[in-house]
Amino acid sequence: MTGSMQSWCKTVCAAAVLLVGTVAPGAADLALAESSVVVLGAQTRAEHKQFVASFKQFLVEQEQGVQFFDIALGDDIGNTDGLKDIIRQNKVPLILTVGPEAFQSVLRQQAAPPLIAGLTYDAAELEKHPNATGVVLEYRVETQLAWIKRILPDFKTIGVLYNPEASGQRVAAAKKAATKLGLKFVAQEVNSPSELPVAMESLFRRVDVLWGLTDPVVLSRQTAKAILLTSFRNKVPFIAPSSAWVKAGALYSLEVAYSDIGVQTGEMARSVLRGKRVSSIAPQEPREVRYSLNLRTAEHMRLKFSGDVVSGAAQVFE
């Protein structure tokens, strides 16, 4: 056995968690069954654990004899020969990656096995690889705009700040979706965070609401305070990408249900284990939509939600 295989074996023996079946101590003796799933990625955060637990529970109930091999990126499996060895020396039926780092680690391997990406945002990247699919964490722009119309039915002009290089394609899709929904869409380019103050002042004079499209240039820890304060001062509601922003003063955000995403991803895995090609399974958005509301912000902006909107919220800050 090579040194790299011995190192990988130690990693697997230390990190593997089997819900069904047993693991032999030698990597060469793994002999992965047709119903084996290698789960690659860190599971330190609560939502990651919830996602993986839900994924496994679904498959255990659906697939008799399914086995899971958990490998954490913290064991440097993505930066050593370990991942190459398991792919080269074992016929891996399926890999589930947890998070974008794990996803990219598998894509860097030659002849990567069928892959389902969990907890990643990049649907476009998934679509580039015929041997990969998954459930992305972000809702399609069509879904997000439809929810703006549902929660704020009187707001007709939607504004967005975006970096053309990072988000140009999504903004183009959003413009088309807004037109179909009868909404006016105003997009303001931002090439660097330093341009945000002027861009916001210009945009806020022309829109009813600011939609927080996830964009690495526009939305970050460094820009959060300025965006929230400008929104509050101009009384233009900010629709945020997460409940953390809502707690800090944004009006609302759409949320994902990690347990449901685990089941949704598990359904994809079941199809692959039963013989369906990954290339025939299109990437999906989360099918369950949850949202958080900030009633303090709504009161400041003299907004009133319908009773159904308030009662339907997964989380309410007041």
Kindly label every feature range from the protein language model.
Residues 19-29:
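C-terminal segment of classical bacterial N-terminal signal peptides
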Residues 8, 21-22, 33, 148:
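Low-complexity, intrinsically disordered/propeptide-like segments
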Residues 2-16:
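Bacterial N-terminal signal peptides that target proteins for export
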Residues 28-318:
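Short hydrophobic alpha-helices and adjacent helix-cap/hinge residues
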Residues 9, 22-23, 63, 87:
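Generic low-complexity, intrinsically disordered sequence content enriched
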